[in-house]
Each structure stands twice: as C-alpha cells, then as structure tokens.
Amino acid sequence: PDHCQTLLETLERYPNCKMVGNATTFRMFEQFYNTPKPEQYHQIKEGDEICLGKHTLVSYTMPMVHWPEVTCTYEKSTGTLFSADAFGTFGTVNGNIFADQTDFVATYEEEARRYYTNIVGKYGPQVQNALRKISSLDIKRIAPLHGPIWRTPETIEYILHKYLHWSSYTAEKKGVVIAFGSMYGNTRAIAQQLAKQLSKRGVTDIKIYDVSKTNPSYIIADAWKYTNLVTIAPTYNLNLYLTMENFIHELKALNFQNHKVSIIGNHSWASAAMKTMVAHFENDFKDIEIVSQPLDIKSSLKEEDIPLIEKMADDIKASIDAQEIK
C-alpha cells in the first residue's frame, strides 16, 4: 500500500491501461481495494518479457523480499534493475537522487542497515536466492522503491556486498551492544559498569541502549552489525521487564542469529528476568552462543558484584578476540 495508493484511481481514470503483475499481485490488489479489475490485468511470471519499443522489461520474482508478490524488473537496454524494496534505505533523499552524488557510506549505510534488518531481515534465505538470481545480469544501475539510485560500479558493488553480508546474519564489526531496561536506575548502573570494564580491557565500539527509550529498530540494526550483544533487565511482576521482553521478541521475529549473547538479570524478591532471557536465547533462536555465566544481581550493584562483572567482561573480550570478521 505504501507504493500503490493511487493505483485504483489510475485504473478507473484510464480504463484502457493495464496493470502488470503476477497472480499474487492481483489477489493482494483485490484484498486491499475490494474492486476487482480482471479486464485490466496483464499477468506475468518469472522470465517473461514485455517490449515497449525501445525498452524491454524482464520479470524476476523475489518472493518475501519482503512481500510474497514482489517482482523486480530488469530493463535490458539501460541495464536498470527496478528492485522493489530490495536495496532500499529509510529516510528521504536530500536533492541528490544518486548515491554517488553523496558520501554514500556516511549518508546511507546506517539507514540502509536499519531498513534491511527491520524490514527484510527475517528473510535472509530469500534474499540470498534473489541475489543468485540477478547475479548474471549486467546491472548498470539499481533503482529501489526507497532511498537513492545506485548507478556506478562502486556503489552497486557496495550495496550488493552489504546485502550478501546482512542476509548471512554475520557480524560486520567487532564490538558490543549493551541493551538494558531499568525501572529505578539500578540496572542502568550495571550496564554502565560492564561497559566500563569492557573499555578497560580494550574493547572498542561499545553501544549502550535503553530499551525503554530507544526505538527497537536502532538497537536491532546495531545488534546485527556487531559481534556481541548483552541484555540486562530486571524482573517485573514475576516476569521479564516488558520492554526487554518486547525487544527480544522483535529480535526473534526478525530471525536474529549467528551472534554471541551475554545476559544479566536483576531482582529484589523473586528472580525471573535472567532465567527468562536465557530460555529465550537458548530455545527461540538459532546459532546463538551464550558467552559467560549469566548473572543475577540482587536489587543494586554492590562491591561484591564487581568481580562477577569483571569476569563477564573478560569472557566477552575473549569472545570478541576469537571471532573473525569476513
């Protein structure tokens, strides 16, 4: 719907025009607009060509990147791949519509990663299939539905490489994302102490996020990017603190995997947070390794807890050092 809100009106204003799509496209159209237009449908399938005179369009299906009806179109004479949602970014272009007109890494990489991980991230295998499908094409520009147009060899290679990496669920960089939830500030202090100990050990690229204040999409993008994730949260009404529960649920929904995770819970009279987080990462995720013995702090960080935090920092540092970034 974010791409075709004027489609019904267009068909009604111009009754001789045709809507090109696959069978799923037309089913979706009728579901959203409740106005079947079968006389205006032109159904296509994988590999079909439409000649427009000078231009010839070839269809390639990309199911679940990120909707089931998605079809990208390759225009032969210009080498243009109209890639639908693939290779897009969040945000708007600022005058320059081509990535090479900007410092594209600084301008678009963070938002391209956040877009991929939160919109397409669940469908890594489907993205890999799509990349294989278009690998034989002579692509001279990529025109997605969101974000800039990639039109130079450098920018095209850049975004294709990023999608190949992101869809493999492997980290791009050594570093630690610490995601915490805190009701009174005590759990925040635990997160800050762990970050301090990691820094003392030479760990760089430490990101601290309060899951109650930061939109999950930003935390998820960095969790994808860096090798290690730490979740720190208190018990709330015999359950895991709800904003942390929601964050972990978001990670699960996006098929987060192939990373290292460490866990710290906090409780005052009945412990549930630590056990719940351990159960989530052990049972609900694939290829997640829990690094260091999960900790369960009682109410607030005390002097006798510091050695436990130091031990976890040692283990995380060793985990980071042992990993190779490809």
Model-derived features: positions:
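Di-metal (Zn2+ and/or Mg2+/Mn2+) metal-binding site signature of metallo-dependent hydrolases
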Residues: P1-L11
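Short acidic active-site motifs
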Residues: T6, T214-I219
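Catalytic core of the metallo-beta-lactamase
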Residues: E12, Y33-T102
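Short internal beta-strands
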Residues: N16-T25
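Short hydrophobic segments within beta-strands
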Residues: S83, I178-G181, I264
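FMN-binding flavodoxin-like domain, especially the glycine-rich phosphate-binding loop
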Residues: V93, F104-I142, G147-I149, Q193-Y209, ...
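Terminal amphipathic helices with adjacent charged low-complexity linkers/tails
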Residues: R141-K173
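Short, charged N-terminal beta->alpha structural module
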Residues: A179-K200
